[in-house]
From Swiss-Prot:
It is found in: Cell membrane; Secreted, Cell wall. It is an enzyme of class 2 (transferase). InterPro entries: Glycosyltrans_GT2/GT47, Nucleotide-diphossugar_trans. The lineage of its organism: Eukaryota, Fungi, Dikarya, Ascomycota, Pezizomycotina. GO terms for molecular function: glycosyltransferase activity. This is Type 2 glycosyltransferase. GO terms for cellular component: extracellular region; plasma membrane. Glycosyltransferase involved in the maintenance of the outermost surface of the fungal cell wall. Likely functions in the synthesis of a currently unknown, potentially minor but widespread, extracellular or outer cell wall polysaccharide which plays a key role in facilitating many interactions between plants and fungi by enabling hyphal growth on solid matrices.
């Protein structure tokens, strides 16, 4: 082979091999220790940089202090609790803890068939103002919407029927509202611990407690950085009544769409996104005096709860990042650390890949340093990253350390739960409670189709455009004039509203449902 032929080996006839060879790594690079080292560093930064930042942010988090002269007191608060419980007497301890905080009113909302039983419980409570409402079906969004228009106080607290409040909660949860830009306030939470029962019951109970503890860690950290969170918990949250009682909110709350369906699940996610899209700030009061207690399943039913939460996260985070996109400008760190992490945090894939890339990436090192690097990563992964978010649990109950291996194993299994939730996004059932799925088909109902006269025809145009008098294209001046005029619109919360449309197209319809206004060159859809 001549020297010129040897130089041309591997080159394309068009001479593109040169630029490609400069811009792309060689084939051997993908199997080299350098590639694995780069991969390790990239994965490590993505997985642990936000954790280290969150550690500092969480440890330095400060709740809003109680003002000496508060703008709002407990008498400015109405508590709304939707419930479909089968044994209302079991709600008494929770309701009494809430009434001990002395709100102005407590509104309970259930279904038609359960109203009498709930009314008996309400009448037995020693409190001057407890109101019971009902809806035709069991659906949290519809039940909440039944109560919100009847709220007469400036602050509304929405709560679940199984939470227990400390008597000190009210002044702490109201303190952030001294800032007029704050629209919603959440609390820290803990799970009611089971100290009796079998070891498996205690283990499931601890997994639920660990889930809530991690959530406390994350939302306090992100709020301290940019005031963001992926979801304000529906277990207990305080909001300005002007937000929740507005027509736009109520309509959107009852008519949220997920793909081609009306979504009546994920209510707390909707409220959170609504606050963000309307430039309201949120806050979390991370104080013992503002810590509510809740209950989770202490058996395999906990897996149903995890899958339901995971579906909500997939749906809501996709809506936040892709459909609405307000978070990109308002909560950039939260977008990266919480929303984007939903799509990338699969520990059962990332952790083994981190250890493997650490080992293969240090292949050129001497064996002693190579082992030191590997075991340093191993200890950091399992002794720090798997523990730091749970320190609150271990401080309160040091014996919980025995459940740490259970937490690690479940963390890997939870990645599979997330993938299962991803491929079953259209499921909205609770699965974990017998009374939770009475009207499950209403949680994801087909969205109503618009009238045929309102549909956009095939083609590049976005509206049907008619012009009865002018047979040619409108002039530019006419188009500008039209753009400056008012439009009538269609409101899905009402019946048919005339839609005023114009067109530069030379089309004259023949339709008995269309009335042409000859004087204004417009057409009205009736």
């Amino acid at each position: 082979m001549s020297e010129s032929e040897h130089q041309n080996v591997g080159r394309s006839p068009l001479g593109f091999a040169g630029p490609l060879s400069l811009s792309m790594p060689s084939f051997d690079f993908w199997y080299s220790s350098t590639f694995w080292l780069y991969l390790f560093l990239g994965l490590w930064f993505h997985r642990y940089f936000r954790l280290l930042v969150h550690c500092v942010s969480h440890w330095t988090y400060k709740s809003k202090p109680i003002p000496s002269k508060p703008t709002f007191t407990s008498k400015d608060v109405t508590v709304v609790i939707p419930t479909i419980h089968n044994a209302f007497e079991e709600l008494r301890p929770s309701l009494e803890s809430i009434l001990a905080c002395e709100p102005a009113e407590l509104i309970l909302v259930t279904t038609h068939d359960k109203r009498k039983e709930l009314q008996k419980l309400a009448d037995s409570l020693v409190f001057p103002k407890v109101r019971v409402l009902d809806t035709p079906i069991a659906n949290k969004r519809l039940q909440v919407c039944e109560a919100l228009p009847k709220v007469e106080t400036p602050i509304t607290i929405m709560a679940d029927d199984d939470v227990t409040w400390p008597s000190t909660l009210m002044p702490w949860i109201l303190a952030p509202f001294e800032d007029p830009e704050i629209g919603g306030v959440g609390t820290c939470q803990r799970v009611r611990r089971e100290h009796d029962g079998s070891w498996s019951t205690k283990a499931w109970n601890w997994l639920g407690a660990a889930y809530i503890e991690r959530r406390n860690f994350e939302i306090s950290a992100t709020h301290n950085i940019d005031g963001g969170t992926s979801c304000m918990s529906g277990r207990t949250g305080a909001y300005r009544s002007e937000i929740l009682s507005s027509h736009d909110f109520l309509h959107g709350f009852k008519n949220e769409k997920w793909r081609k369906w009306i979504l009546n699940a994920d209510d707390d996610n909707f409220v959170t996104r609504w606050l963000v899209s309307h430039q309201w700030k949120t806050w979390i009061q991370y104080e013992k005096e503002c810590e509510i207690e809740t209950t989770l399943e202490n058996s395999t039913k906990f897996l149903y709860q995890c899958s339901r939460w995971a579906r909500s996260n997939w749906r809501s985070n996709w809506t936040s990042m892709v459909t609405e996109r307000y978070i990109w400008k308002q909560q950039l760190w939260c977008t990266y650390a919480l929303h984007f992490a939903t799509f990338t945090s699969l520990a059962f894939l990332i952790d083994p890949l981190l250890l493997a890339s650490c080992w293969w990436g240090t292949a050129d090192w001497d064996m002693q340093n190579r082992r030191y690097a590997f075991w340093s990563q191993f200890v950091f992964m399992f002794a720090f990253t798997k523990v730091v978010k749970l320190m609150g649990l271990f401080i309160r109950n040091p014996t919980d350390v025995m459940f740490l291996p259970v937490s690690v194993v479940f963390g890997y299994f939870h990645g599979l739960v997330k993938l299962y939730a991803l491929i079953t996004l259209n499921m909205t059932s609770w699965g974990s409670r017998a009374d939770g799925d009475a009207n499950d088909e209403q949680r994801l109902a087909p969205a109503p189709q618009p009238s045929i006269v309102l549909k956009t025809p095939p083609g590049k145009g976005s509206l049907i455009r008619y012009n009865a008098r002018q047979k040619g294209r409108q002039t530019q001046a006419q188009q500008v004039s039209w753009e400056k005029s008012d439009y009538a619109s269609y409101d899905s919360s009402t019946s048919y509203v005339p839609i005023r449309v114009h067109t530069p197209m030379a089309t004259t319809p023949i339709d008995t449902k269309l009335y042409t206004n000859e004087s204004s060159n417009t057409c009205w859809a009736i």
